Amino acid sequence: VYALVKETARRFSLGNIEVKATSNDLYLAEKYDFVEILGETAIYKNHWDVMGVPYSWNMVHYDEQLLGGILLHYGYATEMATGEGKTLVATLPVFLNALSHEGVHVITVNDYLSKRDFETTRPLYMFYGLSADCIEYYNRYDRRRKETYKSDIFFGMHSSFTFDYLYDHIAIKPEECVQQKHNYAIIDELD
């Protein structure tokens, strides 16, 4: 699976990826700027906006990053310095564990990083039909926040996940709960 993600990242770094359009591609093209439909072809662009700024994908996993992804998948803490590619490394175990459709929490220290990492990596996940969203776009009482938790992958900051968990445990009615699944989590800045 990691080789598949690495190859997709490599293809994105070289340019747009063209595939036969599926219903999922049509849906994504209506919602996001990184997919375009031309006839029966879906074009996944290697450039899109991240936090309102134009961004071009230019990252490919190094062997050391693949090893980091394996360690994270098996539950080990992995220390990486600034600039060593934590966001890229996290794509590997996130992708692998999202294949079960049981939910993957990507937990960051602030809403900026949650949104940035989501917007940077979502084409990589969505190219394979995985759903992804970020809870930081919606407040606790917005129905879209509950829908976000139904995604295969959801990004958010640690305090948001914590408070959603606590509120769910004091909810009077089941429909007031927003969290759905607790399967796998990646925590950025564990310290």
Feature-to-residue mapping (PLM):
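Conserved P-loop NTPase motor core
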Residues: 1-191
